[in-house]
């Protein structure tokens, strides 16, 4: 008698379906829900459906695990062979918007909360272009999954666990650590024989497939979908895809984004900033040309009107040419252009041109001095303003904080 048909419902087959029928339906549904075939805004939902189909097939394709599922279902108590695996009730709820507990669809049946495994975080460097346009990141990962033969118990069918001999059934061991010549600390560590359960199977009762560990390594290609509004340190989560263990709810695999430095743009929030390099002639007379290539590959043409003179350090704002504010609308931040004027090199302007420029450009007013003021003629040398105040003679000294030897005071008699 079949006590639970949820996995069959996911694969859209009858619980008496043959192995060939199950395989055929799995291939059809896997192709239908494959994330690569979904639009970018539906990829996460498709990935959830695809994972649910995959997990259901992983159990039903194996005759032994299918038999155990038919006998005990997914949520029985002491006899459950699937406890600690992927939570298919959550998968069903995400796929169909229903609560599939032991009482059936729509029933609010409380469920014992299981311990949760650790998350796995992968740091990923991404270009500013990919953060602007969005990207699918594929990551090949290896994780521990519940053994398909023993469903994570680590022992043969109907074999009983016994107190772990390594930790005396406590699940932890005492660990002595020398922290100094005459000092030792005592701490507890999880038993590596029973993985903290306190019980284990004897040698003859252990599952031969996983050698009693309850898990086997599995390689999977995970897909993470970076939205076009992604920011530094954003986390993209594949829930429940970390290591599995018996009696444990798997943690998440997390992709944490780190933006690579960009040669042209600097980002702050939804805004971008770039240097606008122009010649002195352009600063004085205006220009009309492509000034840079945008993150989506467009050439950005800018018109500076004649008569509008630009100065070093001026800021020009181009509205709506920054980053996307979110993944659902076309609202964008602004592009800030910082004017950087390139002056001509020494000797480029001849004597005749110099006289013409002096006639055209306004002159600087002279500093007025008294007739009897002593005038010194000086010349400068090229320098670096960052060296200002850096005279080695005054290094590590605070101006105005000098101390002097004083005259000893006479003590009162």
Curated annotation (Swiss-Prot):
Which gene is the coding source of this polypeptide chain? xdj1
Keyword Ligase annotated: no
Q: Enumerate the CXXCXGXG motif repeat regions by residue range.
A: 147-154, 164-171, 191-198, 207-214
Modification sites for Cysteine methyl ester: 410
For this UniProt entry, the molecular function terms from Gene Ontology, in alphabetical order, are: Hsp70 protein binding; protein-folding chaperone binding; unfolded protein binding; zinc ion binding
Q: Which GO terms describe its biological process?
A: protein refolding
> Where found, per UniProt?
Endoplasmic reticulum membrane
Q: Which InterPro entries match?
A: DnaJ_C, DnaJ_domain, DnaJ_domain_CS, DNJA1/2-like, HSP40/DnaJ_pept-bd, HSP_DnaJ_Cys-rich_dom, HSP_DnaJ_Cys-rich_dom_sf, J_dom_sf
Checking PANTHER family in the record gives:
DNAJ-LIKE-2, ISOFORM A-RELATED
The propeptide sits at 411-413
Domain of life (superkingdom): Eukaryota
Task: Say where the protein is mainly found.
Answer: endoplasmic reticulum
Q: Any idea what this protein is called?
A: DnaJ protein homolog xdj1
Instruction: Give GO cellular component annotations, separated by semicolons.
Output: cytoplasm; endoplasmic reticulum membrane; mitochondrion; nucleus
J domain location is 6-73
Q: Which keywords accompany this UniProt record?
A: Chaperone, Endoplasmic reticulum, Lipoprotein, Membrane, Metal-binding, Methylation, Prenylation, Repeat, Zinc, Zinc-finger
Looking up PROSITE patterns in the UniProt record yields: DNAJ_1, DNAJ_2, ZF_CR
Residues covalently joined to lipid (S-farnesyl cysteine): 410
Q: Which organism is it from?
A: Schizosaccharomyces pombe (strain 972 / ATCC 24843) (Fission yeast)
Report the Gene3D superfamilies cross-referenced here. Answer: DnaJ domain, Heat shock protein DnaJ, cysteine-rich domain, Urease metallochaperone UreE, N-terminal domain
The membrane topology of this protein is:
Lipid-anchor
**Zinc finger region(s), CR-type:** 134-219
């Amino acid at each position: 008698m079949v006590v639970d048909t949820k996995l069959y419902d996911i694969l859209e087959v009858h619980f008496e379906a043959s192995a060939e029928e199950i395989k055929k339906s799995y291939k059809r549904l896997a192709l239908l829900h494959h994330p690569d075939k979904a639009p970018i805004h539906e990829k996460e939902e498709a990935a959830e459906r695809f994972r649910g189909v995959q997990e259901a097939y992983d159990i039903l394709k194996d005759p032994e695990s299918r038999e155990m599922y038919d006998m005990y279902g997914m949520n029985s108590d002491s006899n459950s062979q699937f406890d600690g695996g992927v939570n298919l009730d959550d998968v069903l709820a995400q796929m169909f918007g229903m609560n599939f507990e032991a009482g059936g669809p729509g029933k609010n049946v409380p469920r014992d909360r299981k311990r949760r495994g650790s998350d796995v975080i992968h740091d990923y460097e991404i270009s500013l272009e990919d953060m602007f346009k969005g990207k699918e990141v594929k990551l090949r990962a290896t994780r521990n999954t519940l053994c398909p033969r023993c469903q994570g118990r680590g022992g043969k069918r109907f074999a009983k666990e016994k107190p772990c001999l390594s930790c005396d059934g406590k699940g932890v061991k005492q660990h002595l650590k020398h922290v100094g010549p005459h000092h030792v600390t005592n701490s507890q560590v999880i038993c590596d024989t029973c993985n903290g359960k306190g019980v284990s199977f004897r040698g003859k009762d252990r599952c031969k497939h996983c050698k009693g560990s309850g898990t086997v390594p599995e390689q999977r290609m995970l897909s993470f979908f970076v939205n076009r509004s992604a920011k530094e340190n954003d986390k993209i989560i594949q829930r429940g895809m970390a290591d599995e263990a018996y009696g444990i709810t798997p943690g998440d695999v997390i992709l944490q984004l780190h933006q690579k430095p960009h040669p042209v743009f600097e980002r702050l929030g939804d805004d971008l900033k770039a240097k606008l390099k122009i010649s002195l002639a352009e600063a004085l007379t205006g220009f009309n040309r492509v000034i840079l290539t945008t993150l989506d590959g467009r050439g950005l043409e800018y018109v500076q009107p004649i008569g509008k003179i630009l100065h070093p350090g001026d800021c020009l704002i181009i509205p709506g040419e920054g980053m996307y504010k979110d993944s659902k609308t076309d609202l964008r931040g602004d592009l800030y252009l910082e004017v950087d004027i390139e002056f001509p090199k020494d000797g480029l302007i001849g004597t005749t041109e110099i006289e013409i420029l002096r006639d055209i450009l306004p002159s600087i007013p002279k500093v007025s001095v008294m007739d009897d003021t002593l005038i010194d003629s000086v010349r400068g040398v090229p320098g670096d303003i960052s060296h200002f105040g850096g005279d080695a003679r005054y290094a590590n000294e605070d101006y105005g904080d000098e101390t002097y030897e004083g005259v000893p005071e006479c003590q009162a008699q």
